[in-house]
Every structure is written in C-alpha cells, then in structure tokens.
C-alpha cells in the first residue's frame, strides 16, 4: 500500500486501520512500514513519525523521503531515535528490530522481501509524488513504480523456482 501519510497522526491512523484489517483475517498477517521524513520541514515531527511506525508495525524500515538540502543520514537518525525509543512492550507482538536503509528503492525492496502471504506493507510519506528532491534537484522516483518492479521480480523468481 502506497500512501501519502507524512505526519505522525496520519501514520498512526493508517497503521491502526491496517492492523484491524489484518486481525480480522482468518490468518492474521503482519504489518511492515517504510518511512522517512522530509528535509527542510518540521523537524519536531521526525521522532514522532518513528514512534508511530514502531508502535504500529512489526517491521519498520527507516529510509529517505525528500531530504531536500539536509543531510539524509541526519534526518534518518531523528526518525530512528523515535522508533527505537519505543519499548518492546509497546510494540506489536513479534516485532523485529527497526532497520535503516538509506536508499528508498532498496528500503521498499527490503520490506517487500520480508513480507509473507497475508502480510501488509505500507510505503508511507510520498504517495502520489513522482520525484525525490535531493540537494535542490528533483530526481524521477515513484514509490508505485518501485513496488511494481520489486513485485514483478518476486513473481518472476517464484515462477523460476528461485524464491
């Protein structure tokens, strides 16, 4: 699921909905999230984004969003701090360690490869956007295209018997 959720409340709401849907299935699935925060924007929300992700997903991958003119690693560190501050008791049962994968395409692939049938992967923050702004340059990038490419590769791997 690709969603524009780019504020802590939105992340929390989407994850709550996904968790409820997963729990309603005959075989409850797990939830993963790929999340980052934009540069040159509200810095106070970064740890809150990480916290919301960690409270609502078994698997959290912190990555780059639109770093703009800021250091992407510094932005990720702030999101990670919020995610890692959430204690095990406040995370979903079976939650894994929070991961950091700077490259957004690689982060998406990491989450999709983690997922099993019945799981849900939320790619949060960019939604409909078709570019990633880095150092004042907007590079072509669409989460939806990356998801399609990764899933196509997974289907091809399964058909070949390699997965």
Predicted segment positions?
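ATP-dependent carboxylate-amine ligase
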Residues: 1-163
């Amino acid at each position: 699921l690709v969603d524009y959720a780019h504020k802590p409340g939105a992340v929390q709401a989407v994850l709550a909905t996904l968790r409820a849907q997963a729990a309603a299935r005959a075989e409850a699935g797990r939830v993963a999230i790929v999340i980052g925060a934009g540069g040159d924007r509200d810095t106070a929300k970064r740890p809150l984004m990480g916290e919301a992700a960690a409270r609502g997903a078994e698997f959290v991958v912190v990555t780059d969003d639109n770093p703009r003119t800021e250091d992407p690693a510094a932005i990720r560190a702030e999101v990670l701090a919020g995610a890692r501050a959430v204690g095990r008791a406040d995370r979903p049962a079976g939650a894994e360690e929070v991961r950091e994968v700077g490259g957004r395409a690689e982060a998406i692939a990491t989450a999709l490869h983690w997922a099993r049938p019945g799981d849900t992967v939320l790619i949060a923050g960019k939604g409909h956007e078709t570019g990633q702004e880095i150092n004042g340059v907007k590079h072509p990038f669409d989460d939806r295209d990356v998801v399609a490419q990764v899933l196509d590769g997974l289907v091809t791997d399964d058909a070949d018997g390699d997965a």
